[in-house]
Amino acid sequence: MAVKLRVHPAFYRRVRHYRDRIAIHDARPQVADRFVNAAQGLVFQLLENPHRGHIAGFEPTDLADILRIAVPGFPVFAVFYRWDGQTLTVITLEHTAQDLPSRLAGIISTP
């Protein structure tokens, strides 16, 4: 059975945000390219094995089923996603120092 993939627009926005921050603000364009490739590659890996991540552990019940996995080579960044047994829903990519529960609640409440 093929896994369905849904990607929330917030994922693309955050990848672009951090890519630009690394490339421009930190003046490291090669690292920014590696970051984007690592984030995209991680989504493909999750398609093959959605159980790779672990429960994020958020208290609000509407966030209780969200999984997280670190971006390879960039451990301060994580991809947050849901897996219902058929569909992989990639929600966002965040720096782990953020106020993650409120950020994710805002994202998932927006279609």
Regions found by a protein language model. Give the residues of each.
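Arg/Lys-rich, positively charged N-terminal/basic patches that mediate binding to nucleic acids
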Residues: 1-40
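Generic structural signal for secondary-structure transition and capping sites
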Residues: 20, 27, 44, 48-52, ...
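Enriched for short, Lys/Arg-rich terminal
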Residues: 71-111
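A short, surface-exposed loop/turn module that caps and links secondary-structure elements
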Residues: 44-72
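Exposed loop/turn and edge beta-strand positions of beta-sandwich/beta-sheet ligand-binding modules
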Residues: 1, 65, 75
